[in-house]
């Protein structure tokens, strides 16, 4: 048993170290190929471009390639400096447009304000003209009336006024009397109107009381039907039309 265990341990230890040994023993062809390719490329370069030719050709190529690269670098460096110059060159052309855009609402507002002021001024002028015309017309009218009155009323107007005054006074007095009478009549009507309305009601009630009679002299037959038919008076046997006053028969003591 002990031997078997030792053998198993040895086998396991060999299996653990086996891949490392295998890698060490196995060759690596791809590394060799890379090294060989690099060496081959170096040899080709040496053959095609010897050291003297490379030294001779390099300054010319460098001179040709350098200005192009230098120009590009200068352009990149100078571009932010040139940009404001271009903006400054174009700015005077763009500036009037901007000023026009900025000034346009102000000018429009000024125009509108000027038009409003003109309208207000024109309205004020019209009002002033109308007032002046009214004043002129009133003055002319008053002057004409004064002239006509002076023509109609000569130097002695008081006498004519005294002559005409009684007639005018009588007419005015009669007019005032008529107005007062009309007002009094209206007031009387307003006062008498409820009394006149009450009078027919009182008369109707009195007529009904008279028809019935306190002593039983007469009787009223009410209208009960929908058509004017004859009705009999209660306990009398007499056929009468509605609302006709009938005398009651007189009964003797013997009957």
Swiss-Prot record:
Keywords of the record, alphabetical order, are: Disulfide bond, Repeat, Sporozoite, Sporulation
Q: In which ranges do the sequence repeats occur?
A: 18-48, 49-57, 58-65, 66-78, 79-90, 91-103, 104-140, 141-152, 153-164, 165-172, 173-192, 193-210
Q: Where is this region: Disordered?
A: 18-90, 149-224
* Segments of this protein annotated with the region 12 X approximate tandem repeats, Gln-rich: 18-210
Presence of keyword Glycoprotein: no
Q: How does it assemble?
A: May be covalently linked by disulfide bonds to other polypeptides to form the 80 kDa antigen.
Q: In UniProt terms, what function does this protein have?
A: Unknown. The Gln-rich tandem repeats may be important for an unknown aspect of the parasitic life cycle. May be an important immunogen.
Name of the molecule in the record: Antigen LPMC-61
